[in-house]
């Protein structure tokens, strides 16, 4: 680190500019009379010395910075392994000590030299608790915001115009304005927050972030994508549209080489296990590990929706207290909550998203909303995230969220997505706020916040091209070819299309449930659920070397129609996947 070249500063900024810069630095270092009075008198000299050090050194290096780190003094030591790890990757970090308000902290970021080269902002520390009121009053932190003992970083509050009509708080908690350099409502750089409340939580989370990127190179679970869905309850028309659009997004947005599971809180669906086992099944899916774990449905700050079934009490899908049951065995998943309020990091106690992130064996990152959400804007956001992750395979999670948010606030047609055009058309007819769709999208850009590291490198499996004949007759062999990039065990499978079941359904109706003894009432439901999530007709295993491969697969027991051929190669340090389509014809 270097001291400031004051002669350069005076010539570059002029007298007035220098005074403004010094004022911002002073505020950014959290020095103001009222705050210093709250620090114990015996610690005044220590406080001034520490603040002076951070003013002169931590925020004053004139270098090409790509990442701004907003971190309280009290958490810096716990963050140090992350800093060293990222710097070894080539990142240039600029530290900013949070001020007493989000506005002052943002002003410090805007005043940084060479700000145009900044690509990401990491906020470290929890936010003060929102109480209520038109001005976004917040509970006074202990120690006070702005002292060197505080571990909190304030957030912004935006006036709600659309979601407040449907029961939301009048203000939307959002970190987005930190990354909106020109104030146009569109984020300009990647952004994330690690909402740790103490050094221990941060130390543990930093270790897990580093482990996520360095370990799990060949873990089978990195090809998993898990979906959990609640029942809409918006009315038959809206629920039908949401179901149709969700199927389209999931079916077309995720490559067929990935293994997708669905757990649906509708007792009449084959994707619903026995109702009493639903919550544990949801947690089991998480604990399997995966690239993503996505919840779609109703939510609140501390719990998700409930499952309702005949002769059963309301059964919670997931509660914040269930975080203790998270014991992920594979790749810690990135969690996405397409639901209301689950990401309210300004809550008096840790929200469901924060608890999933901070659990010792929990999620590696969470994207969730701080307030009441709407189906249209969430669908637009989800569509864009699927494309950024699976079509373009953006390297970092921060990039995925950044580009998804930019597309969310863009006018129709800018994204080039046919799904976006469909969503806009449906919303114009079916949305209760059809005249405020632009405002709805803007509010969702604010309320969806990434709780996690924006520099996190997504742990994708590697891909390869798989080829086979377009048609095969049932009972004959299908030749599958691929160019293996690694040595390992290859598994070649013929599977159903997503949403197509291999077996006939059991009877799921109210009369059948009520006519059955309680001990046998839900018999077969969990077995059918497992079958619905097992699409494999045929599976063959071969050891392969690097280079062209050709494997013959006997296609028997498969139904006629369009099927999918999947290939997975398990190497010592890599997992490689690919897929192709084949039509199975009857004899």
Where are these regions (language model features)?
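Structured catalytic cores of large enzymes
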Residues: 85-88, 103-261, 276, 412-416, ...
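Active-site-proximal C-terminal subdomain of hydrolase catalytic domains
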Residues: 95-96, 128-129, 338, 342-466
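Catalytic-core segments of thiol-dependent peptidases
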Residues: 112-135, 143-144, 231-232, 238-241, ...
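Catalytic cores of nucleophile-dependent amide-cleaving enzymes
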Residues: 153-208, 301, 306-382
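Surface beta-strand/loop "capping" patches
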Residues: 455-490
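Beta-strand-rich binding/interaction modules
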Residues: 477-507, 563-567
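Aromatic sugar-binding surface patches on proteins
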Residues: 518-552
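Edge beta-strands of extracellular beta-sandwich domains
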Residues: 574-585
